[in-house]
Amino acid sequence: MKPSIYSLTRDELIEWAVERGQKQFRATQIWDWLYKKRVQSFEEMTNISKDFVSILNDSFCVNPLKQRVVQESADGTVKYLFELPDGMLIETVLMRQHYGHSVCVTTQVGCNIGCTFCASGLIKKQRDLNSGEITAQIMLVQKYFDDRKQGERVSHVVVMGIGEPFDNYKNVMCFLRVINDDNGLAIGARHITVSTSGLAHKIRDFANEGVQVNLAVSLHAPNNDLRSSIMRVNRSFPLEKLFSAIEYYIEKTNRRVTFEYIMLNEVNDSIKQAQELADLTKTIRKLSYVNLIPYNPVSEHDQYSRSPKERVLAFYDVLKKNGVNCVVRQEHGTDIDAACGQLRSKTMKKDREKVTATK
């Protein structure tokens, strides 16, 4: 199976081309065709010799993904189900915001983190995506915009889809460098957010990268007992380790950390728990932000339900009174399979039923 050329950073592409007897500018031309003209085949690169196009075709594919399902919401949210070269399925979401167009990308096939409320973890991790497969998600959404010919572009990226990004650290970092490259898609680092469930050692590594990319942490509970019961990762990285790493990140980068907090009815949404959360984040209040997220129910996790609006607002009020920077997240795509992993899970179930029916 040939790798996608999207797996290479610009420097790596230059090195690869020079090793094959090409001038550096040839790699720059190829990069422009990929990320500025956004061609889908090497044959479309009209200023590249046929001999070198043949070498490119022997070495790489361009976009490795195949579109399986597209769902479009009344609010303009678009959910894509893509098939990988090995037949596995991943999800990508386009969200139209007042500030631009944001894309949520997947980094793994399945997830091993084991959050008990999440659709993504219904199927255990089968493999990491390579950086080309992650970048290809952005390129296909941008192609959707290009085909519409309305001058739209992907302006923001959130690495919050299926999988734990920091469990696929090397490929995620390569992806970030490709989409941030000023000579390509040029998506600003401060318009990119990577979300982790709390791999403390990788948060420290991320702090040392020197990138201006935003960091979000999936917190979802204000104490170790509750967090360990709903997020298995907390047993390896309890709040003490997690917050030590977060404090290191803030000290090293002077950048704000966003805490994601899904509101689960009568699980983590009490007034007492709101006060615990305010106390937990007290020492980093100036450089932290809490995002309260309405829960998208998942049929396989029917022990959980969405917090009623009045409980969310009461929780929010406690945080605000304690000086916590916080917001209730705007919902997108509520009329489609909005929860991360739902569309993939449903499609895989249908595929299995078709196979069974033909036997």
UniProtKB/Swiss-Prot annotation:
Annotated organism of origin: Streptococcus pyogenes serotype M2 (strain MGAS10270)
Any further remark recorded for this protein: Reaction proceeds by a ping-pong mechanism involving intermediate methylation of a conserved cysteine residue.
Molecular function (Gene Ontology), one example: rRNA (adenine(2503)-C2-)-methyltransferase activity
Catalysed conversion reaction: adenosine(2503) in 23S rRNA + 2 reduced [2Fe-2S]-[ferredoxin] + 2 S-adenosyl-L-methionine = 2-methyladenosine(2503) in 23S rRNA + 5'-deoxyadenosine + L-methionine + 2 oxidized [2Fe-2S]-[ferredoxin] + S-adenosyl-L-homocysteine; adenosine(37) in tRNA + 2 reduced [2Fe-2S]-[ferredoxin] + 2 S-adenosyl-L-methionine = 2-methyladenosine(37) in tRNA + 5'-deoxyadenosine + L-methionine + 2 oxidized [2Fe-2S]-[ferredoxin] + S-adenosyl-L-homocysteine
Protein purpose: Specifically methylates position 2 of adenine 2503 in 23S rRNA and position 2 of adenine 37 in tRNAs.
Cofactor binding: number and manner: Binds 1 [4Fe-4S] cluster. The cluster is coordinated with 3 cysteines and an exchangeable S-adenosyl-L-methionine.
Residues annotated for [4Fe-4S] cluster binding in this entry: C111, C115, C118
Required cofactor names: [4Fe-4S] cluster
One GO location term (cellular component): cytoplasm
Disulfide bonds: C104-C340
GO annotation (BP), single: rRNA base methylation
Binding annotation for S-adenosyl-L-methionine: G163, E164, S195, S218, L219, H220, N296
Domain Radical SAM core: 97-329
Primary location: cytoplasm
Protein's cellular compartments: Cytoplasm
EC number: 2.1.1.192
UniProt keyword annotations, A-Z: 4Fe-4S, Cytoplasm, Disulfide bond, Iron, Iron-sulfur, Metal-binding, Methyltransferase, rRNA processing, S-adenosyl-L-methionine, Transferase, tRNA processing
Protein name: Probable dual-specificity RNA methyltransferase RlmN
Annotated InterPro entries: Aldolase_TIM, Methyltransferase_A, RlmN_N, RNA_MTrfase_RlmN, rRNA_lsu_MTrfase_RlmN/Cfr, rSAM
Keyword Transferase tagged: yes
Pfam families documented for this protein: Radical_SAM, RlmN_N
Active site per the UniProt annotation: E91 (proton acceptor), C340 (s-methylcysteine intermediate)
Assigned protein family: Belongs to the radical SAM superfamily. RlmN family.
